Amino acid sequence: MKQISSGEVWRWNKEVEMNSIRDCLKHCSSIAIDTEFPGCLKETPMDASEEIRYRDMKFNVDNTHLIQLGFTLFDRRGFAKTWEINLSDFDEHKCFKNDKSIAFLKSNGLNLDKIREEGIGIDEFFRDFSQILTEKDGKITWVNFQGSYDNAYLVKGLTGGKPLPETKEEFHETVQQLLGKFVFDVKKIAESCSGLSSQFGLQRIADVLQMKRVGKAHHAGSDSELTARVFTKLTFDLLNSRKQSVRRVDHQQFQLEQQQHQQFMMTRCYIPIPMPIPRPRPVMFAAHHQNPYFGGGYFRMPVQGMNYVL
């Protein structure tokens, strides 16, 4: 995939960039997303059940604000453009946060003060973005990496900041209603790829695939762009692998059919056909000779089983 361009979205250039997103979405049907947020207020144990995981995610998303949202629009031809939307609702001094997560984001170059001062309001952005999605002709494929929280923040934004549904089943139904059926997690796709593991992070998978990052890690725009390229690479390789498997199966089937055909032809044409057993002939005896097996002047000797009268 060739990187075309990228842009940061602030309050002062929002109109121009939102129009650019609208125009690009006319030609692209896939969106890779990434979110940066203030971390988890309630951390979930590794061995937690799905219900507990959803309950904790709901609590975290309902009580925190997005900081950045990254979009990369792309299609099968590889055309792509990336946007990094800076959202102003998070106030480091007033809002709930995980201190370790905030320190981590700062260490990776996020300027939280600038985002707070020059960013776009979350409600304002999602109001415009929802309108753009309704104008899209055709279905959209959404791509993320370990994207439960990405999907959750999208649902929260697209529903006007409402709390997430009470159960994970209702949440999945809401995701399908808002985003459609085509939502792919690259981390899960990696499970099916040779040499990769679902335990790998995005950067490690990119390193294995020998892909260079564009921009800084743990910035929403850069992460979404890398997610799009990794997704394109993995799905392309899986498709080729499947085609090769089909060709191998077809070749094996062809060989089997050839063997069966040869065996059939040998059975029909090349195995010597046994000569038919001739019908017994009546024995002729010489009437004028002591030894009936010599001479002429023949008469028939009845043979049993040949409908002759004894």
UniProtKB/Swiss-Prot annotation:
Gene3D superfamilies listed in its UniProt record: Ribonuclease H-like superfamily/Ribonuclease H
A single GO cellular-component term on record: cytoplasm
Record field: catalytic activity: Exonucleolytic cleavage of poly(A) to 5'-AMP
E.C. number: 3.1.13.4
Residue sites binding a divalent metal cation per the record: D34, E36, D150, D223
Cited InterPro entries: CNOT7/CNOT8/Pop2, RNase_CAF1, RNaseH-like_sf, RNaseH_sf
Main location: nucleus
Molecular functions per Gene Ontology: metal ion binding; poly(A)-specific ribonuclease activity; RNA binding
Keywords: Cytoplasm, Exonuclease, Hydrolase, Metal-binding, Nuclease, Nucleus, RNA-binding, Transcription, Transcription regulation
Superkingdom of origin organism: Eukaryota
Cofactor: a divalent metal cation
Compartments where found: Nucleus; Cytoplasm
Function: Ubiquitous transcription factor required for a diverse set of processes. It is a component of the CCR4 complex involved in the control of gene expression.
Family, as annotated: Belongs to the CAF1 family.
Subunit structure comment from the entry: Component of the CCR4-NOT complex, at least composed of CRR4 and CAF1 proteins.
Name of the protein in question: Putative CCR4-associated factor 1 homolog 3
Record organism: Arabidopsis thaliana
